[in-house]
Amino acid sequence: MKDVYLYIVEKSVALEFDSAEYGRLARKTVELLYDRKEELTDDRIAILLNISTAETRRILQYLMKQNLVGVKKRSTEDYRIEYTWYVNDEVISQAVKYRAKVVREKISLMIKALTEEAFYVCPNCFMRYPVEEVMERGGVCPICGSHLEYVENVEEINKLTKVFEKLDKI
């Protein structure tokens, strides 16, 4: 499950910041937190990874909003607020289960749409169109002008159902 978690962290950060490098930094950050099994401040993480504190904070705050890391807030002796970050098996489990739930919901909607409607696909650009839209456009793809082809949804529904069942076991 840890590998799935690391993949989720890396890809979500890379997409959010439009940078594969940020994705790799996020992966290193959570690996560090998990391997050390202790709560660390963002300054300490930045020093250990040899990256700027600003980058570390940016990544950690995004991961916190996505519930991909744990955070604790405490007051210091000089009345400043200090955040400490952690990753443990519970954080990983909750993150993966939440992502699986979101994907299951999307797959469920896709299965419902595929069972309730017929679709046509463009053989060139592979865009999918419902019957109503095909009738309005005269069976021609609005993007490339190719003739749209009817698609049997049974195989696709079966594949999606199998994926849904696998995710249900998580």
From Swiss-Prot:
PANTHER family: GENERAL TRANSCRIPTION FACTOR IIE SUBUNIT 1 (PTHR13097:SF7), TRANSCRIPTION INITIATION FACTOR IIE, ALPHA SUBUNIT (PTHR13097). It comes from the Archaea. The keyword Glycosyltransferase does not apply. It comes from Pyrobaculum calidifontis (strain DSM 21063 / JCM 11548 / VA1). This is Transcription factor E. GO terms for biological process: regulation of DNA-templated transcription; transcription initiation at RNA polymerase II promoter. Transcription factor that plays a role in the activation of archaeal genes transcribed by RNA polymerase. Facilitates transcription initiation by enhancing TATA-box recognition by TATA-box-binding protein (Tbp), and transcription factor B (Tfb) and RNA polymerase recruitment. Not absolutely required for transcription in vitro, but particularly important in cases where Tbp or Tfb function is not optimal. It dynamically alters the nucleic acid-binding properties of RNA polymerases by stabilizing the initiation complex and destabilizing elongation complexes. Monomer. Interaction with RNA polymerase subunits RpoF and RpoE is necessary for Tfe stimulatory transcription activity. Able to interact with Tbp and RNA polymerase in the absence of DNA promoter. Interacts both with the preinitiation and elongation complexes. Pfam families: TFIIE_alpha (PF02002).
